[in-house]
């Protein structure tokens, strides 16, 4: 059985390793001949763990300030300089209530059992007892590691691809399809990964699109032909049906709110009369009586009431699984043809996505112009012969703000990283916001632009919605995760960028700025379009996405 001390050393070695191959080799060498491979891999990937601990960084600080009898304010101030694991380690070492162990005695199994128990309680008194109990058997470094597991970020600079491909060269790709970590590890030991398929009622990583800034680029990407599909301004939904059971998952593989999808339980059996089990990729949109899509955000309970005679409508664009048959390795044109054969449209309830077979550039331009004229979001372009590759950005999306050559071809989904005090009537409140993106290579957050122009009501709401730490433009208080140049140091930084809001930012064009840290990329005349509540930081525009977006 692997000890927590061994696991901590592995994490340290992975962090200091220079690249993908070296990190994966370290993991592969470590798990070889160990019986608890699954547990090791599971804990190396805490972000994939579906256990919920009901506490963020601020709550962890609050609870441990009570346990250690330390100043909560001092602990929060220390957190502003780094991250939660270091803060807890520092104050555990200094506290006089619980003496840290001199020698590590915990196994990974002990830690995993603790995490399971912690996920089952919600009362603060119960959480305090459990956190006290685990601290009493930890060294300072042990507790730091446990807290980072609760926070679901070990900061080892190694994501799922690095870790899973240490098991087998194609384990990561298989995982994105099956989403079953235990099955992958068991089958890898038997060299039988190819047998793993989609499991109905278990979410699949959705296939994604990268931004496209020209019609010419689209034809270079798909020289053998493409489908142009309307990009619906709704919410991505993966539909699973197994006999009379249903499951609905969002783009980040979380359950969709029931009020948005409950109606589908009545209509899916009518639209797919021959299907016993099925998995669909689709978009749910609120439409009017003429099946015209209504604005994004109208799916909410209160917002929907503003639109009389409206209906929830499922626009189906792919069939991934049908009655025991995994269809993801079949070319798109065959999947689409099959979908046409097995699905019966129910007007305003379940319909096919609008799809056009494109053969030349002028046709694509016409289809794009038509979509924008109808005030639709744009187009998604798909290889006509393409297979469905879970989690991969093989499609292209065009949703232009401006049609003129050289103008910004797409908006960017950026994360709120900080804020500045406003001036004049807006003095004393956060009125200007620092927007940025995540750099997968460095594990840091980089700045892209500042954004303002919100109305008074929106600003009033944002003061409460955004969880900020006041740093008063002090360079010494810039958190470890943020890379920002001196002239853009904000008055406030977000407590946790991975929990921050994602805003769609549009502008006249992408520009070069030596002052911003996202490879010098910025946005000219940035403007806030909307909050992307349907996305997590993982689906936001990362630095590599931004670089691709600016290439013409």
Swiss-Prot record:
Residues where Mg(2+) 1 binds: 283
A GO term, aspect molecular function: metal ion binding
Positions of ATP binding: 229, 236, 283, 382, 397
Keyword Membrane on entry: no
Induction of synthesis: Expressed in the early phase of the viral replicative cycle.
Any matching Pfam family: DNA_ligase_A_N
Gene3D superfamilies xref list: 3.30.1490.70, DNA ligase, ATP-dependent, N-terminal domain, DNA ligase/mRNA capping enzyme, Nucleic acid-binding proteins
GO biological process: cell division; DNA biosynthetic process; DNA recombination; double-strand break repair; lagging strand elongation
Family named by the database record: Belongs to the ATP-dependent DNA ligase family.
Protein name, entry field: DNA ligase
Organism: Vaccinia virus (strain Western Reserve)
Gene from which the chain derives: OPG180
């Amino acid at each position: 059985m692997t000890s927590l001390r061994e696991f901590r050393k592995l994490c340290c070695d992975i962090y200091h390793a220079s690249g993908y191959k070296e990190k994966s080799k370290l993991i592969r060498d470590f798990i070889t001949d160990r019986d608890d491979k699954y547990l090791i891999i599971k804990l190396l990937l805490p972000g994939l763990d579906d256990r919920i601990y009901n506490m963020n960084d601020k709550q962890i600080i609050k609870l441990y300030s009570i346990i250690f009898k330390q100043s909560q304010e001092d602990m929060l101030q220390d957190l502003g300089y780094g991250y939660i694991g270091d803060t807890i380690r520092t104050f555990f070492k200094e506290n006089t209530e619980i003496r840290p162990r001199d020698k590590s005695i915990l196994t990974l199994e002990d830690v995993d059992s603790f995490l399971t128990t912690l996920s089952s309680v919600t009362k603060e008194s119960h959480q305090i007892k459990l956190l006290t109990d685990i601290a009493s058997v930890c060294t300072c470094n042990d507790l730091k590691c446990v807290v980072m597991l609760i926070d679901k970020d070990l900061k080892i600079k190694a994501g799922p691809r690095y870790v899973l491909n240490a098991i087998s060269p194609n384990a990561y790709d298989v995982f994105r399809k099956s989403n079953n970590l235990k099955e992958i590890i068991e089958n890898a030991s038997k060299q039988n990964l190819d047998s793993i398929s989609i499991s109905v009622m278990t979410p699949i990583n959705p296939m994604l699109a990268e931004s496209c800034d020209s019609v010419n680029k689209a034809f270079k990407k798909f020289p053998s032909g493409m489908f142009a599909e309307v990009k619906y301004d709704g919410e991505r939904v993966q539909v699973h049906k197994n006999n009379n059971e249903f499951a609905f998952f969002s783009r980040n593989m979380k359950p969709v709110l029931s009020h948005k999808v409950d109606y589908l339980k009545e209509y899916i059996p009518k639209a797919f009369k021959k299907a016993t089990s099925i998995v669909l990729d689709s978009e749910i949109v609120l439409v009017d009586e003429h099946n015209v899509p209504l604005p994004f955000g109208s799916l909410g309970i209160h917002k929907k009431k503003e639109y009389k005679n409206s209906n929830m409508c499922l626009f189906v664009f792919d069939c991934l699984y049908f009655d025991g048959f995994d269809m993801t390795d079949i070319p798109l044109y065959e999947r689409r043809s099959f979908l046409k054969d097995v699905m019966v449209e129910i007007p305003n309830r379940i319909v096919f996505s609008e799809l056009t077979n494109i053969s030349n550039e002028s046709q694509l331009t016409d289809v794009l112009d038509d979509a924008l004229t109808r005030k639709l979001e744009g187009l998604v372009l798909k290889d006509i012969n393409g297979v469905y590759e879970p989690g991969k950005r093989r499609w292209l999306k065009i949703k232009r703000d401006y049609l003129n050559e050289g103008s910004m071809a797409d908006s960017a989904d950026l994360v709120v990283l900080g804020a500045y005090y406003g001036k004049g009537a807006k003095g004393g409140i956060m009125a200007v916001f620092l927007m940025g993106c995540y750099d997968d290579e460095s594990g840091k957050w980089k700045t892209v632009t500042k954004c303002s122009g919100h109305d008074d009501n929106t600003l009033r709401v944002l003061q409460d919605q955004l969880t900020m730490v006041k740093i008063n433009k002090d360079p010494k208080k810039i958190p470890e995760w943020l890379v920002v140049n001196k002239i853009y140091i904000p008055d406030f930084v977000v407590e946790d960028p991975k929990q921050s809001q994602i805003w769609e930012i549009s502008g006249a064009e992408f520009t070069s700025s030596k002052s911003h840290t996202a490879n010098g990329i910025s946005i000219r005349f940035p403007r806030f379009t909307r909050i992307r509540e349907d996305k997590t930081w993982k689906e936001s525009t990362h630095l590599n996405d931004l670089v691709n977006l600016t290439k013409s």
